[in-house]
């Protein structure tokens, strides 16, 4: 007896349609090669008759097994996948609105400097209206764009300022409402330009995985680059926005990797050189079917071997001294590394020697003490000749030699040298 297939509910049908729609332009395998492609698996099961319940079970099991962050990425990809791509004429119109938004924000920034505080939205809108009304009055029948200094000069005139105030006061609500609508439309245009190109960010971010930043961080940094591209895009140049935005997205991601992926930050130019060395090494390995030598890589990169070695050493990641060593993991890497600097015991001994030496020198006369300090560099570490010391004291080098000899004889007395003998090993 043939079993009747259970029909899908409206919500379940919509959910399956979203999965099928998403799979047309997003390959989640690129996110992690070790993961199962749940979309493909679901579609295969859904293609067989009467398996809708199994589809839902597979989806729930997959979500349970995946970490929260990966599931968040999946939801994010689904959301941006529903956003329609822009047509060329739409890009141009949105770019014009974004340019208008930047002009409005520039007026706000100038007003902030003028008022020495953040202006209210009403003050901002009023200033925009004044500037544009002044521009219209200056243009008149000339149909020539007035310069900024001409507009500023017009507004500086008290009569013109009073005239603008009176005209604004006749319809303040209407003028302010028009400004707010204009601001809303411009901001929405910027959001639409950015949201419609978020898939481009994901596509570029995938190429920079496993370089020290998580996939979520790469998407976030790339999105900041996309926002910057939307603000800088000039539609009059004739190229597509996606072509222009690609450079800004890549720049934002590579700079973030250089700044955040390493404990010890490397300059951006050095990080870019490291990336080129890696690409060159991979290319030479494919061509020669063996690991290239340092000389071959340096020749291909047109740099010296010394510079190549320096960059390669800079690219090494630091290792924590707390890294466990051995099967039992009861030892740490720091236990096996000899310290290059002085031990605490040596430092204490040196401080005690310095104190005792000062006490012994204080038993000499001031001139004898100063001569020994200069002769043996006790103050600055530089030993001076008898001639140099003689010039300082304005006496002959022979006199300095006599003072030195007398001071050393005093120091050899048992009452003095017994203290210092303890430091001789």
Curated annotation (Swiss-Prot):
GO molecular function: DNA binding; sigma factor activity
DNA-binding region: 386-405
CDD domains according to UniProt: Sigma70_r4 (cd06171)
Region of interest (Sigma-70 factor domain-4), ranges: 360-413
GO biological process, one term: DNA-templated transcription initiation
Subcellular location: Cytoplasm
Record region (Sigma-70 factor domain-3): 272-347
Chain positions of motif Interaction with polymerase core subunit RpoC: 217-220
Region spans: Sigma-70 factor domain-2: 193-263
A GO term from the CC aspect: cytoplasm
Pfam families assigned: Sigma70_r1_2, Sigma70_r2, Sigma70_r3, Sigma70_r4
Record's keyword terms, sorted: Cytoplasm, DNA-binding, Sigma factor, Transcription, Transcription regulation
Entry similarity comment: Belongs to the sigma-70 factor family. RpoD/SigA subfamily.
Function: Sigma factors are initiation factors that promote the attachment of RNA polymerase to specific initiation sites and are then released. This sigma factor is the primary sigma factor during exponential growth.
Subunit and interaction comment: Interacts transiently with the RNA polymerase catalytic core.
Protein name: RNA polymerase sigma factor SigA
Gene: sigA
